[in-house]
Amino acid sequence: MITAKAVKELRERTGAGMMDCKKALTETNGDMEKAVEVLREKGLAAAAKKAGRVAAEGIVKTYVSEDMKKGSIVEINCETDFVALNEEFVGFAGRVAELVANSNVNTVEELLAEKLDGDKTVQEVLTELIAKIGENMSVRRFERFSVESGLVQSYIHGGGRIGVMAELACEASSPVLAEVAKDVCMQIAAANPLFLSEADVDQESLEKEKEIYRAQALNEGKPEHIVDKMVMGRIKKYCKEVCLLDQAWVKDGDKSISKLLEEKSKEVGSPITITKFVRFERGEGIEKKEENFAEEVAKMGGK
């Protein structure tokens, strides 16, 4: 009988997953040393040992169905920009993106348990890739898009450094819609809006900005009776910066995104609205590990 204590010990020694450790111990009739060898032979121990490294590089990949009715965006991380360009790594990211679009998974854990290559799960394929390439990798996040009237569009910038996906609703069917959607995606990539419209700005963020602007105005020595007007003016400016519909279009600074949609709606004969968007920037929010230079030199010198 394989005990929980034995599984725990094997996990601590190899860093491999719980189920992999249990299988290895079962295969070797509980022999700890042989189980370690089994995991090493399968590449699972080596892969798991790399899991302590920070994976802050990688790629953002998108998938849009041929009819443009559904799509997905995923971020998959690795340790170096060199591996981020590896064909197998990029191919894996593309297949995962397509899987997300065609599945009902809601969490990364559920995605990792989905079948990707025949009987192999995403996690198993990823583990094999880690062992083969020799770097830690992780599926970090994803979003799925689906629309009935309208379309889904995507845009990738900088070879996967930034990825955007947007969902536009429109009753009319026109090539113009795809063009508008591409422009909207490029806008999101370039201007990084936080909200769709002023109505979507959460009250907490708004109040925080108001406090900052009020303090700035008072510190500038402005009279109390005009401070409120100044604050409202600066809030309006803030919304133009962070709300997609209020932003100046990157292709024409005299026109806002809402104005662009208004013009194109007239052109296609039906209202065009943005119902959802997301922007992923590779590695954002991941704290990279900083190596101590002296330690690095010592390591290279074999000290």
Curated annotation (Swiss-Prot):
Q: Which key words tag this protein in UniProt?
A: Cytoplasm, Elongation factor, Protein biosynthesis
* Subcellular location, record wording: Cytoplasm
Query: GO MF annotations for this entry?
Result: translation elongation factor activity
The family database entries (Gene3D superfamilies) matched by this protein are listed as: 1.10.286.20, DNA helicase RuvA subunit, C-terminal domain, Elongation factor Ts, dimerisation domain
Region annotation (Involved in Mg(2+) ion dislocation from EF-Tu) ranges: 80-83
Q: Extract the PROSITE patterns matched here.
A: EF_TS_1, EF_TS_2
One GO CC term, this protein? cytoplasm
InterPro entries, from UniProt?
EF-Ts_dimer_sf, Transl_elong_EFTs/EF1B, Transl_elong_EFTs/EF1B_dimer, Transl_elong_Ts_CS, UBA-like_sf
Its principal location?
cytoplasm
What family is this protein classified in?
Belongs to the EF-Ts family.
Q: What does this protein do?
A: Associates with the EF-Tu.GDP complex and induces the exchange of GDP to GTP. It remains bound to the aminoacyl-tRNA.EF-Tu.GTP complex up to the GTP hydrolysis stage on the ribosome.
Q: What is this protein called?
A: Elongation factor Ts
